[in-house]
Regions:
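Short, ordered loop/turn segments at secondary-structure junctions
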Residues: 40-42, 242, 326, 339-340, ...
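Structured, non-catalytic alpha/beta "coupling" segments that mediate domain-domain communication
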Residues: 76, 90, 103-104, 229-242, ...
Length: 720
């Protein structure tokens, strides 16, 4: 890596040491995956995690894009014969793309402007003379340039003005100052357009009808909301800077002390025109684009963090679950699943209008029969259409059962997408889309990660303004989040679907399908080493993937840990030193392992960080990180918004976290909002400092708007 590139990356990643950045890039260049590096190359990187490694990768791409653009610009100017050593040095020293573009602007091929025409008419010497003029007789000088193309003095002066205005607008120094000044002191103004109020019938953008805020204080969600309002032709948006301060700067920068008064006024007017026609609009476009890019990055980050917490929700293990896909006219689809997610029974009941009364009366008995026949312990109700009516029906029904039966409201976003997919058709070819959806809802409760990876992450609605975000950047981030979650948890090699396996480090959909096919043809895997026999799974893929694949009850006990086979030798040494033969995972074995002085086992190949990981894995073979996370909130009774009163204490599940707060499901039809100012008594900017998707939280009702069906909540206990 070039020294300048490393310096640039260090500036963007100040919390990391140069050695860490270089080591991470070297490992990535060798074809190692981020999960593999984070887990198994801690000594090399100084224990960088997946998020830090992804940040290094992203910054490296930015640096490469900058260097590529610098070379393209240098080549283009060189081909024009206008590249000087000083200009080359300026371009190569630039650390931002907009600086490179500013330097390139005077040499950039552009459409034939008025200034270009004036140059072709031979008026550039006149513009240069006026800029430096110590004489007041501009008309006299302009008369010298009258020709067939320039019929009079006024035409000559207008041409000189065009040349000066364009030249001023292309000054990299002026553009840099104006950009920084506007960024620091400019304001974003939004107003309602004529007729916009009629278009905004529900008042979604009402708070932006007469809105202004400093650019430096614009929140990402406001930027995206204003952009959406502008796109809908409801809002008019502009960026304003103090024109007098801008003009004073331009005058100071451009007008020579020795200039004659008439020449000075001419240059001032040209500068004012340059700002009005060229500089102002260009910088406004640039800053609007920058604001949008930053807002998009933040929104994508929010989406990614919410998705991660959704994927990492604790699974419900060892329970028979009934998936309940609510509907009105077409009936509610039910799917009974055994503790491993295997389908036992599907049914359709009609508990809601417009179904005939006899069908509605039969629905309760049908549900009770399924619960008793299959000893259902939990019911997963999708949160879509007819969800709250179905919740009420389920709550009333389970009261008639003597043993405990609970229900959970499950986010069904994307369930219909998966149910209509080829994968779902292949698994359940005889079932309708709706019945497959009930299966998906039930499995989401049993193992959220295994089920949610089957659909596109974009279909899971846990973001803000996600449909306005750049699709490619969103996909890259969300794919990385899914990969991080799947590899942190690990998967059972003998039960995992190909969709889950495809997210394991080093694997893809093709290799994952090959693994499943090999498993179906040859029986269950009894050793990780058998992976080497899977078609097209080469040494590199094996190295990257094997540590994240678990085998329960296999030939090698270490295969049910996240210890990499490359470390089996040292793992066995540790077991031997602790005097452990076969009782791996027992409390006694864990105690003996934790008492070891592992520093004596440090070598060139195995460092302290890896040894600590190995000890943790040996103490808890087969561990699932998600088991320590809060379980879903189980309910037996139902609430309505009419039941809520200010001051009432409730328990709820965080469904979504956005920049301005968190949406909490407290058991009514619509999620309540905890504004960021009500998350904690302390001042915080980012709600994710306090809450995450899936958290179980205590809240108090602040206000209830029955007309708009909105509930304001607080996590700060009243009168505390």
């Amino acid at each position: 890596m070039e020294k300048n590139d490393l310096k640039l990356m260090s500036q963007q990643l100040p919390e990391l040491r140069d050695r860490q950045i270089e080591a991470a890039l070297s490992l990535l260049e060798e074809g190692n995956t981020i999960p593999f590096i984070a887990r198994y190359r801690k000594e090399a990187t100084g224990s960088l995690d997946e998020v830090q490694l992804q940040g290094i990768q992203e910054q490296w791409h930015r640096v490469k894009n900058l260097r590529d653009r610098q070379q393209t610009v240098i080549k283009a100017i060189e081909e024009q014969g206008k590249l000087t050593p000083a200009l080359r040095m300026q371009i190569e020293a630039a650390t931002e793309l907009n600086v490179v573009e500013d330097l390139y602007l005077p040499y950039k091929k552009k459409r034939r402007t008025k200034a270009q025409i004036a140059r072709e008419q031979g008026l550039k010497p006149l513009a240069n003379w006026i800029f430096m003029a110590k004489e007041n007789d501009l008309d006299g000088k302009a008369a010298e340039f009258i020709s067939q193309d320039v019929p009079d003095v006024q035409t000559a002066l207008e041409g000189a003005n065009e040349i000066l205005a364009e030249t001023i607008s292309e000054s990299s120094t002026i553009r840099a100052w104006l950009r920084n000044y506007t960024k620091q002191h400019g304001e974003l103004i939004a107003t309602v357009k004529k007729g916009g109020q009629e278009l905004d019938s529900e008042g979604v953008y009402q708070q932006y009808y007469d809105f202004s805020a400093p650019l430096s204080a614009m929140n990402s969600y406001r930027v995206l909301a204003i952009n959406r309002g502008e796109k809908a032709k409801i809002l008019s948006v502009k960026i304003l800077a103090d024109e007098q301060i801008v003009q004073n700067y331009l005058n100071f920068r451009l007008v020579k002390k020795s200039s004659a008064q008439n020449a000075a006024e001419f240059v001032k007017n040209a500068a004012a025109e340059a700002y009005k026609r060229f500089l102002g609009p260009a910088i406004e476009r640039e800053l609007r684009r920058e604001l949008t890019e930053q807002a998009n990055e933040q929104a994508i980050k929010v989406f990614g963090e919410n998705l991660y917490h959704l994927l990492m929700q604790a699974p419900i293990k060892g329970k028979v679950v009934l998936g309940f896909d609510p509907a009105y006219r077409t009936g509610c689809k039910l799917a009974v699943l055994d503790p491993n997610g295997k389908l036992l029974k599907v049914a359709v009941i009609y508990p809601h209008k417009p179904a005939p009364e006899n069908q509605r009366q039969q629905a309760e008995g049908q549900l009770l029969q399924l619960i008793e026949d299959y000893q259902v312990e939990m019911i997963a109700i999708g949160n879509g259409t007819a969800s709250r009516e179905s919740e009420r029906f389920v709550a009333q029904t389970i009261k008639k059962i003597k043993r405990p039966v609970y229900y959970v409201i499950v986010n069904e976003s994307g369930a219909s997408v998966y149910s209509a997919s080829q994968d779902a058709r292949d698994e359940f070819p005889e079932l309708t889309v709706e019945k497959r959806s009930a299966i998906s809802i039930g499995r989401r409760l049993q193992d959220p990660l295994a089920e949610l990876v089957k659909i596109s992450p974009e279909a899971i609605g846990v973001g803000q303004y996600q449909h306005d975000l750049p699709k490619t950047a969103l996909k890259v981030e969300l794919d990385a989040v899914v990969e991080r979650a799947v590899n942190r948890v690990g998967v059972n090699l003998n039960t995992a679907s190909y969709q889950l396996l495809a997210h394991i480090a080093g694997l893809n959909a093709t290799l994952a399908k090959n693994i499943v096919r090999y498993r179906n043809e040859n029986g269950r895997f009894t050793s990780r080493m058998q992976l080497k026999s899977v078609p097209r799974l080469g040494p590199k893929a094996f190295q990257q993937a094997v540590g994240f694949l678990r085998i329960v009850d296999g030939d090698e006990p270490l295969d049910n840990t996240d210890i990499h086979p490359e470390s089996y030798a040292i793992a066995r040494q540790l077991l031997q030193a602790a005097g452990i033969a076969s009782e791996l995972g027992s409390p006694m074995a864990a105690q003996q392992l934790r008492q070891l002085d592992i520093k004596q086992f440090v070598s060139e190949k195995v460092g302290l960080a890896t040894l600590k990981d190995i000890i943790a894995s040996l103490c808890e073979p087969g561990r699932d990180l998600r088991d320590s996370l809060p379980a879903p909130l189980l309910r037996q009774d139902v609430l309505t918004i009419e039941d809520l009163k200010p001051g009432m204490q409730l328990q709820g599940t965080v469904r979504n976290v956005v920049d301005f707060g968190a949406f909490v499901d407290v058991g009514i039809k619509h999620d309540g909002l905890v504004h960021v100012s009500h998350l904690t008594r302390k001042f915080i900017k980012d709600p994710r400092q306090v809450v995450a998707v899936g958290d179980i939280v205590d809240v108090w009702v602040l206000s209830v708007d029955l007309k708009r069906q909105r509930v304001q909540l607080t996590m700060v206990q009243p009168n505390e």
